[in-house]
Structures are given as C-alpha cells and as structure tokens.
Regions:
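A short glycine-rich, Lys/Arg-flanked "PGG" loop and its adjoining helix->strand segment in the class I
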Residues: 121-133
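Conserved S-adenosyl-L-methionine
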Residues: 190-194, 211-220
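A short acidic, Gly/Pro-enriched loop at the edge of an enzyme's catalytic core
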Residues: 96-103
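Conserved class I S-adenosyl-L-methionine
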Residues: 1-48
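Class I SAM-dependent methyltransferase SAM/SAH-binding core
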Residues: 52-94
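SAM-dependent methyltransferase
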Residues: 138-204
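Core SAM-dependent methyltransferase catalytic element
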Residues: 221-237
Length: 237
C-alpha cells in the first residue's frame, strides 16, 4: 500500500487536500473550545498525516503535534513543508511512543484508506494505547451514499484539473484519479477506500473502550457534508 501513496505524494497537495485539512482543523478547534472549554488539548498525534498540513495548522495554533504516515514520500514532503515538526514513517497500526496524547486525529477519510478490516481494528487498538485517559480520537469518514459515482472534472485553476470516477469492488470503493496540467496527463492511479459505516466503526471503537461523543456532517460551521465528522472519547482507565 505504501508504494501507491509514495506515488500519490507527487500530486497529493494539488488535489485540494490542504484546503480541507485547514477547514477540518478550524472546525475541530471550535468544537474543543465549545464542548471541552476546561480541558487541555495541547498534545496531538496526527495519524495517516499525508503531507502534514493539519500538523502545520496545529503548530500555528500553539499545539505540540507529531505526524505519522506509512508513506516515506508523503513524510518527505511533510518534512520539507514543516521542518520544525516531527514526522515519522510507520504503519500506524504498529506505531509506538513513550508519550501519550490529548487527542489523535485522522482526517480526510484517511482511516478508510486502510482497506483491510483487521488492520483497521489494530489501528484502533493502537490509538487507545497512545491516548491519555479521556483523550479524544477525532476523524472523518466518507459518506458514500452522498457521493456521486459519475465521472467528474474538477478544475483546480486555469491550467490544472482532476478527473475522477468511483466504482465499487466488494467492500471497497475505488477512485480512478487522473491529474492534468494544460491538458497533459501527468498522473493516474487507482485509490481504494473501505466502505465502512459510522455504526460499524463505532462498534469497533466501543470494543476498545471508546464512546461516541459527536457525529456531525457539519462540524461547527465547516460544511463538507459528504463526510461524517466523528469524535470518540476514550473512557477513563
């Protein structure tokens, strides 16, 4: 899997992930301020961090953050963008640390890119180990019931565009993604996601000692309604 994302790193930031990561971060901080005004959330671990945009946002807002991703090329881009943030290349289901964290994030439907359900369960178990008591796991899921499976063209600016189309392969959804500059095809690949429901994910997290604290399509005024924004709380040890 890391080979695919090493290749994806070439165009990852061109696909609009930066904008969504910033919106997710802003909505998340509003949530913490309003729902947990008396708690400290100053240590973050961002798993499946990609090119590190969310980590950069956290640092700019006074939060100590670290990013982990299985793709070495993604981590290289993250390190070049944010040289003063620690990034680690590692399978997030196996990552270990001497520290625990106030909250762990996994944005832009990154958990669904772990396409083996057993690996998803291992990742959740590991998140539990890495969180402090009463810490939060904050993530999002694609709601494929609201996403078109028709071929789509997305203009990024006057010269750059994406063409992508989805189809189902058993429990997976495949994105065929093409990236063009000046009508020249520069990158094409298939990206797979696990089609998992909120109920299914919540059951897995309940099994590891989490409770669902919030489930929203808007996440405090950030209106990417095709994704579920989810907050799970680790129960006190």
């Amino acid at each position: 899997m890391h080979d695919l994302y090493d290749d994806f790193a070439k165009v990852y930031d061109e696909c609009g992930v930066d904008d969504y990561s910033l919106s997710f971060g802003k909505g998340m901080l509003k949530y913490l301020d309003l729902i947990h005004p008396d708690e400290s959330f100053k240590k973050n671990l961002d798993i499946c961090c990609g090119t590190g945009t969310l980590c950069g946002f956290f640092k700019d807002n006074g939060i100590k953050t670290k990013g982990v991703d299985i793709s070495n090329e993604m981590i290289k881009v993250a390190q070049s963008k944010y040289p003063d943030i620690e990034f680690v290349t590692c399978d997030v289901s196996k990552y270990s640390d001497d520290e625990t964290y106030d909250f762990i994030t996994c944005s832009d439907d990154a958990l669904q890119h772990i396409t083996n359900i057993d690996d998803t369960k291992k990742t959740i178990k590991n998140v539990n180990k890495l969180l402090r008591p009463n810490g939060l796991f904050i993530l999002d899921l694609n709601n494929f019931n609201l996403i078109s499976f028709e071929k789509r063209n997305k203009s990024l600016d006057e010269t750059r565009r994406l063409v992508y189309q989805l189809h189902r392969e058993n429990e997976l959804v495949c994105y065929n993604v093409k990236y063009y500059e000046n009508d020249e095809l520069l990158w094409e690949n298939n990206v797979f996601e696990l089609d998992i429901s909120v109920d299914e994910l919540t059951q897995m997290l309940n099994d590891e000692g989490f409770i669902l604290e919030s489930c929203s399509q808007h996440f405090f005024f950030e209106k990417q309604i095709k994704k579920w924004k989810l907050v799970y709380k680790k129960t006190d040890d």
